[in-house]
Amino acid sequence: MFLLLPFDSLIVNLLGISLTVLFTLLLVFIIVPAIFGVSFGIRKLYMKTLLKIFAWATLRMERGAKERNHQLYKPYTNGIIAKDPTSLEEEIKEIRRSGSSKALDKTPEFELSDIFYFCRKGMETIMDDEVTKRFSAEELESWNLLSRTNYNFQYISLRLTILWGLGVLIRYCFLLPLRIALAFTGIGLLVVGTTMVGYLPNGRFKEFLSKHVHLMCYRICVRALTAIITYHNRKNRPRNGGICVANHTSPIDVIILASDGYYAMVGQVHGGLMGVIQRAMVKACPHVWFERSEVKDRHLVAKRLTEHVQDKSKLPILIFPEGTCINNTSVMMFKKGSFEIGATVYPVAIKYDPQFGDAFWNSSKYGMVTYLLRMMTSWAIVCSVWYLPPMTREKDEDAVQFANRVKSAIARQGGLVDLLWDGGLKREKVKDTFKEEQQKLYSKMIVGNHEDRSRS
């Protein structure tokens, strides 16, 4: 047997006391408040302190750049090309006017100068298109002391470098272990709690317990990300028998919304840890999980969703119609499937503040584990959530028009760019129909004018 020396025994005792104090503080200041949905204001104080530090760091960088006669890097938030919203016909008219005095309606079917319009548009798209930049992290106006968010960082001063190093120590040596412990606590309680609730007979008591177990666990997971969330217009929160649709930036969108409401999730059945969580959750709550073979069957998916929303006693379904993660600067095309069902739609706009950490998941660049590690080593996740008034499909409106109307409302409320492009372009090639659409517009302009002249 090994005998501990007095000094070694002292170290072991101190370590034991430290861990006891740490877990007591964790329980009192984080887990218990999460269970009851209360906050002591520590996270908001932390956020205000960070803002002051960021402001000071930005001033130091600007001063250092001025002393060295260097221009401080500023991202082009509105794109590198100034674009006016004009139609194809108007732009070609302008090109023809600048080349000759002929007007469009007196011009033959085709002019060689028309080529310049398509060449210019092609060059603009290569340099700064609307779609590709939505699939990469949003650039910041000022550095937030995270090396991965600063694309042009150079040594400025000793104090700023020390501050950055201190930030690395705090994030990796204190916040990361704390957040991992909270994440395991939240996930563990979710699996155990929902499994136990699943054995209870169906009824109000089971529903009550299931709701509070879900809320408790999601709130603990929210604290594992140091998420500071502001909810607006809670009177518009989704109700039973409806569909909640939101813009999609990250997998944590689910946790953000589920920590303030009780939803039925929709998704594909997974294996591993995710599969264990899914099987436990579905025992306590009627979530809608699909097998891999069923996901591609659009009619089967629509049928399952319709059956769910027709039962007004069932929870609102949470759906992200974009189908992929966008970098929270815009909202892209909504898939029409969830708008064909005929249920009341509850739009929700989610807007993250990238100053404290980039919530966007670039799935083509980072795996889930790497992404979660980046989240847990960020300063915090700060976001605003707006619950919009419920919307229903109008009589003269098809599913696509309804989806676009909901999308526009979300984009307007969240201060996001409303785009018609499909988020599927993140992984797929541009369809020929997009190219043909431009050809049709041009041919319609030429042939249309020619036919009008023939009739006259």
Swiss-Prot record:
It is an enzyme of class 2 (transferase). Highly expressed in testis. InterPro entries: LPCAT1-like, Plipid/glycerol_acylTrfase. Glycans are attached at residues 247, 327-328, 362. It comes from the Eukaryota. The chain crosses the membrane at residues 156-176, 180-200. One of its GO terms (cellular component) is endoplasmic reticulum membrane. Its EC number is 2.3.1.15. It catalyses: sn-glycerol 3-phosphate + an acyl-CoA = a 1-acyl-sn-glycero-3-phosphate + CoA; dodecanoyl-CoA + sn-glycerol 3-phosphate = 1-dodecanoyl-sn-glycerol 3-phosphate + CoA; sn-glycerol 3-phosphate + hexadecanoyl-CoA = 1-hexadecanoyl-sn-glycero-3-phosphate + CoA; sn-glycerol 3-phosphate + octadecanoyl-CoA = 1-octadecanoyl-sn-glycero-3-phosphate + CoA. One of its GO terms (biological process) is triglyceride biosynthetic process. Residues 1-37 form the signal peptide. Pathway: Phospholipid metabolism; CDP-diacylglycerol biosynthesis; CDP-diacylglycerol from sn-glycerol 3-phosphate: step 1/3. Its main location: endoplasmic reticulum. PANTHER family: GLYCEROL-3-PHOSPHATE ACYLTRANSFERASE 4, PHOSPHOLIPID ACYLTRANSFERASE. Belongs to the 1-acyl-sn-glycerol-3-phosphate acyltransferase family. This is Glycerol-3-phosphate acyltransferase 4. The lineage of its organism: Eukaryota, Metazoa, Chordata, Craniata, Vertebrata. The gene is Gpat4.
